[in-house]
Amino acid sequence: MPPSPCALCHTNRALILRPKDHSKLCKACFITVFETEIHHTITTNALFTRGERIAIGASGGKDSTVLASVLKTLNERYDYGLDLVLLSIDEGIKGYRDDSLETVKRNAEQYGMDLTILGYDELYGWTMDQVVEQVGKKGNCTYCGVFRRQALDRGAARLGVKHVVTGHNADDVAETVLMNLLRGDLPRLSRTTSIITSTPSASSDPASNTNIKRSKPLKYAYEKEIVLYAHHKSLDYFSTECIYSPEAFRGSARALIKNLERVRPSAILDVVRSGEDMAKLVPGSDEGCGGTCSSNIPVAEEEEGGCGSANGRTVGGDMANMEKQLAQNDTAADQNLEVEITSKKINGAGMPLATGKKGKKGFTPRKSTKQVMGQCKICGYLSSQDVCKACVLLGGLNKARPKNKIEIGYEVQDLQQRDQGADGVANALQRTSIGGD
Amino acid sequence: MPGKHSDSATSELCEKCKENISILVVRAKPICHDCFARYVHTKAIKRLESFRVNFAASPDQQRKILLPLSHGVSSTTLLHILDLHLNTQRSKTNRTGFAISVLVVDEGSLDPARLDKVRERYANHDYASLPLHDVFRLLPDDASLRAFLPESQVQEVCSTQEQLTSLIASLTSATARADVLTTLRTRLIVEHAKQTGCESILWGDSTTRLAEKTLAETAKGRGFSLPWQISDGKSPFDINFHYPLRDVLKKELFSYVDLAEPALSALVYEPQSGATQASMSSKNTTIDDLMKQYFESVEENFPSIVSNVVRTTGKLEVPTGATSNPRCSLCGMPVPDGRFGIHGWGGDQHGGADDAAAVSGGSLCYGCTRSIPQRGTAVASK
């Protein structure tokens, strides 16, 4: 069989079978098509405004590296007029995060972007190494996930940035849609399918931790294409998984997504589309048009692409735990049925079913109440409870600590906030220059 | 496939009645033969309270419902339970709350002897058998279905059988063929129910089947239609849909088939179980097959999660005024805001060139557009 020409330019030899639609493209056309599609996503969803300062959540992995590269290219090519900076969170995991941050530093040099690195120890007083010593390997991902969600917003607030972009791709979104169906989590469907989410603000203070937009320019890009793009542009990225979650394996939803993609390439986008459509069918949801117009959907409980994004976010025991809980709910519901059956047995002895003697209609679950967003009493971050989850976890950690060597400076006043911000930037710059040596 | 039978060496008492020896473990509880039968019956009949005997109506005003029978475990079990239920009603009140009309759809491999056996055992109901290609004859606006036939077939006058064959042959993947066949089967059943005066259709879908359908339709891009496809009550076709077995797992139905007296095994024909496992290559596997395998494995260890998926999807609400939305020409579902085709949403990455094709592309929903091949040139010429 002779090699087939590229489906677009019909000149060069086709080297790439495109994962999204199995079209055959040459290297240059694939890169162009990939970038143009991201551009189309950005423009049709109006993600950016001219002059906006954007923080790219950079982990050194393939998604954020490709995101930074594509945004730089598109910013120059189409003159978005954006000020792009890199924002990294250092969880404090030796042998893993310090190596991936070296990758981010190299990326910062290659792309000519400012880089800010914030550590968990700086924000919370604990590194993940210390957390694991305290709580063990099981459950430490909960701490890391909770801390990370807050850290990006607090880092952006320190930099005075109001927009953070993350590298969530179509596979991540589709996986989350399926997971929410399997878990029965309807309210989260709307949040996870929106391309823009934001942290609603109770105060109009521009320096607060709120009012920060989040968007996902790679929302409709396939993971395989991101890898292909990184490969063909020879991008420098880090691919080791988190050393503290070696037991994390491909969850049910992840494996299912990959099988669906094999059967029908468009299935990933089809799931994303279904997720957007279903979000409008959730009772009590705001009438948004596919999440495009609703730019104020709260981001608080959105799942981050955490450490080891190639692995599922479902640990093996999750389904078993949920099964146990649901089985108990079913047992409680069955009690009503059991009472009904017993009473029927007395009335109509021997009859398998009594007619016209229906007692209780059965167990009717109460409708889930809507979350009301407020502020944490301790740190001022967005929270639906009095105290946010990070502070609750932090309190638990601190109780078990023999003595507090490092005090966490909470940003209560504006002046203190600005000073903290300045110090953070200075420390980050020092770290960058040290790395440069 | 049947539920776990308890070991006879270590028999324990039934957890419900505390009297008989348990023969089965259902949802982690040992249960005896009689209580299991009562369990399944109660789950099904509880869903049919609206079909109780209507003493106010005169005997000739009998309500009629349609039961599509595929000779599978679920629909056969449903027929058995309803037959038992009607016999009980008849013996107690000398009348029944409804009359059953059974429809078997012939897709080319139907053995007439199978239907004869069913008819012989449940003699008090109407029976009909229709070939699938009759959907082209029954649908009043068959012009819209005919539009999807390949180019060469549009010009000629050919039989409904040939139309069906050429339509299926023009589809490019196993998933598309399975999807269109399922859609046409549903349309045929609905049209037959309307023309025979039935007010409702009782589908034999179990919890597991509904969960499979939820994720399969999600993966095909039909998330918008899930409230129509999963919930009891109104359907987009001016007829009610009910799923009486929605609270019973598929593995429980398999146990029921074996334990019923006399056994229903002689009436059941499940050809797919062997074929499904044999064809693991991605060439022949469909999205429905994938979801079936997935939920059969989830059902073994986590049955409550299967129930939870169905319960969750049942909470999705049809938006107000949805029935006035334009309909998909193939599956008949109301499309929100008339957003037909696969273009015009955030995930569509193509520019204005395709917009012209999208406008003239007709009226297929997102999911059906993924199955039916694009005929931009031909459609634009009309």
UniProtKB/Swiss-Prot annotation, chain B:
Extract the InterPro entries matched here.
Answer: CTU2 (IPR019407), Rossmann-like_a/b/a_fold (IPR014729)
Q: Which GO terms describe its molecular function?
A: nucleotidyltransferase activity; sulfurtransferase activity; tRNA binding
Q: What keywords is this UniProt entry annotated with?
A: Cytoplasm, tRNA processing
Location, primary (coarse class): cytoplasm
- Pathway note: tRNA modification; 5-methoxycarbonylmethyl-2-thiouridine-tRNA biosynthesis
Q: Does the keyword Cytoplasm apply?
A: yes
| Transmembrane portions of the chain | none
Q: Might you name a Gene Ontology BP term for this protein?
A: tRNA thio-modification
S-S pairs: none
Where is the protein found, in the record's own terms? Cytoplasm
Q: Which GO terms describe its cellular component?
A: cytosol
Name the protein family.
Belongs to the CTU2/NCS2 family.
Question: What function does this protein fulfil?
Answer: Plays a central role in 2-thiolation of mcm(5)S(2)U at tRNA wobble positions of tRNA(Lys), tRNA(Glu) and tRNA(Gln). May act by forming a heterodimer with NCS6 that ligates sulfur from thiocarboxylated URM1 onto the uridine of tRNAs at wobble position. Prior mcm(5) tRNA modification by the elongator complex is required for 2-thiolation. May also be involved in protein urmylation.
Q: What is this protein called?
A: Cytoplasmic tRNA 2-thiolation protein 2
Organism whose genome encodes this protein: Phaeosphaeria nodorum (strain SN15 / ATCC MYA-4574 / FGSC 10173)
Q: What is the lineage of its organism?
A: Eukaryota, Fungi, Dikarya, Ascomycota, Pezizomycotina
Q: Which gene encodes it?
A: NCS2
